């Protein structure tokens, strides 16, 4: 930071916003090609471009923060605000799904048989796999908090252990959810019940996969001694995101699985 007299990070010109925008265009065009022409070539190209962009952009962020020291307290404050706003936007995203669910379930139309779940739908038992999923995510919330406290206290081994447990629980949750989808007696095309169930729980599952990936990156960074007790925003952001995923699941469980059944 010797070459500047302020605490802010003046970012160097980067190609990643451009390649990110290109990947978004390729993915959306690819989805249309897949839906209408059953061709996945453009979609795969878009997904590959997106993955490469994310990998290289975040690699640059890690270089700037860990090795070049650009992430001063002022910069970290801005990143914190950014992460908080991102999580708020995700809350509003899920609010739309809950709105759709309650709009359909609180006043079922005659087409649904005037009842909820609609006539002919056999909902999943909330006291079986969904309850196990709930306990798995709650346990992962405890282990990520243990990891955070261990990091604050400078206990590297405990932090790695707790982080590994959290990742394992996240993967276990994803596998349970996949098996539940496979065995579900209804599909996404079974009216508004199937739509709201699979879209809401499916997007939550996607967020669990994203959160698990975020934590895996943090795990490998910690193996390379990237985090200290007073400089670890990358891990902190991952922990906040994981707690958000946790809370959304509790609302999904109570609304869709328990009350909705």
From Swiss-Prot:
GO molecular function: cytochrome-c oxidase activity
Mitochondrial intermembrane side, ranges: 35-40, 106-128, 184-190, 257-261
EC id: 7.1.1.9
Record-linked InterPro entries: Cyt_c/ubiquinol_Oxase_su3, Cyt_c_oxase_su3_dom, Cyt_c_oxidase-like_su3, Cyt_c_oxidase_su3-like_sf, Cyt_c_oxidase_su3_a-hlx
Reaction(s) the record says it catalyses: 4 Fe(II)-[cytochrome c] + O2 + 8 H(+)(in) = 4 Fe(III)-[cytochrome c] + 2 H2O + 4 H(+)(out)
Record flagged with keyword Disulfide bond: no
Entries under CDD domains matching the protein: Cyt_c_Oxidase_III (cd01665)
UniProt entry tagged with the keyword Mitochondrion: yes
Transmembrane stretches, start-end: 16-34, 41-66, 73-105, 129-152, 156-183, 191-223, 233-256
GO biological process: mitochondrial electron transport, cytochrome c to oxygen; respiratory chain complex IV assembly
One cellular component (GO) term of this entry: respiratory chain complex IV
Record PROSITE patterns: COX3
Compartments, as annotated in UniProt: Mitochondrion inner membrane
Membrane topology: Multi-pass membrane protein
Mitochondrial matrix side: 1-15, 67-72, 153-155, 224-232
Keyword list, A-Z: Membrane, Mitochondrion, Mitochondrion inner membrane, Translocase, Transmembrane, Transmembrane helix
Listed SUPFAM superfamilies: Cytochrome c oxidase subunit III-like (SSF81452)
Subunit and interaction comment: Component of the cytochrome c oxidase (complex IV, CIV), a multisubunit enzyme composed of 14 subunits. The complex is composed of a catalytic core of 3 subunits MT-CO1, MT-CO2 and MT-CO3, encoded in the mitochondrial DNA, and 11 supernumerary subunits COX4I, COX5A, COX5B, COX6A, COX6B, COX6C, COX7A, COX7B, COX7C, COX8 and NDUFA4, which are encoded in the nuclear genome.
Role, per record: Component of the cytochrome c oxidase, the last enzyme in the mitochondrial electron transport chain which drives oxidative phosphorylation. The respiratory chain contains 3 multisubunit complexes succinate dehydrogenase (complex II, CII), ubiquinol-cytochrome c oxidoreductase (cytochrome b-c1 complex, complex III, CIII) and cytochrome c oxidase (complex IV, CIV), that cooperate to transfer electrons derived from NADH and succinate to molecular oxygen, creating an electrochemical gradient over the inner membrane that drives transmembrane transport and the ATP synthase.
Family under the similarity heading: Belongs to the cytochrome c oxidase subunit 3 family.
Protein name, UniProt field: Cytochrome c oxidase subunit 3
Gene for this chain: MT-CO3
